[in-house]
């Protein structure tokens, strides 16, 4: 029996990062965490491209376009959808989640999910480098491992 598992080595890999400008304070912290994880794992800055989109709803389209170019070994999606007083949160959170999953399946390239869906701004801050770690870091680690796993399968 052979077991395949992704390694946490980013050297020589190319990454696209799609980050939402809405809730920019959170998005920038997630981006910082992702960049830190990539660089600590051996990624070179020249092999990382960042795409800033207006809001979370726009993330799946740009992620799919980036993944479909053939230039990236993985794409990392980052942003924050924070619940408000209307059902808008539910629509956006659901569509972003489904859209990112669909984009990865369609493109055949790992697309990691680092979009926070929280009830409060405080919860988002906790997940963007405070009490609960940095989900941008986690999304980058998942992207690195998946890129390496997919390469092993080729």
UniProtKB/Swiss-Prot annotation:
Group of enzyme by EC: transferase
Pfam families the record matches: DMRL_synthase
Keyword terms: Riboflavin biosynthesis, Transferase
Binding-site list for (2S)-2-hydroxy-3-oxobutyl phosphate: 85-86, 127
GO CC term, one of those recorded: riboflavin synthase complex
UniProt xrefs under HAMAP family: Lumazine_synth (MF_00178)
Family under the similarity heading: Belongs to the DMRL synthase family.
Function in brief: Catalyzes the formation of 6,7-dimethyl-8-ribityllumazine by condensation of 5-amino-6-(D-ribitylamino)uracil with 3,4-dihydroxy-2-butanone 4-phosphate. This is the penultimate step in the biosynthesis of riboflavin.
The protein, known as: 6,7-dimethyl-8-ribityllumazine synthase
The organism of origin for this protein: Syntrophobacter fumaroxidans (strain DSM 10017 / MPOB)
């Amino acid at each position: 029996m052979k077991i395949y598992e992704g390694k946490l080595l980013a050297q020589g890999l190319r990454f696209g990062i799609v980050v939402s400008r809405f809730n920019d304070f959170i998005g920038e912290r997630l981006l910082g965490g992702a960049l830190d994880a990539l660089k600590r794992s051996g990624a070179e800055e020249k092999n990382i491209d960042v795409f800033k989109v207006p809001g979370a709803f726009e993330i799946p389209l740009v992620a799919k376009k980036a993944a479909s170019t053939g230039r990236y070994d993985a794409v990392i999606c980052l942003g924050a959808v924070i619940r408000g007083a209307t059902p808008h949160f539910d629509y956006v959170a659901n569509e972003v989640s489904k859209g990112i999953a669909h984009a990865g399946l369609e493109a055949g390239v790992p697309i990691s999910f680092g979009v926070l869906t929280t009830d409060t701004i405080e919860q988002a801050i906790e997940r963007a480098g405070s009490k609960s770690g940095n989900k941008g870091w986690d999304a980058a680690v998942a992207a690195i491992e998946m890129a390496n796993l997919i390469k092993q399968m080729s």
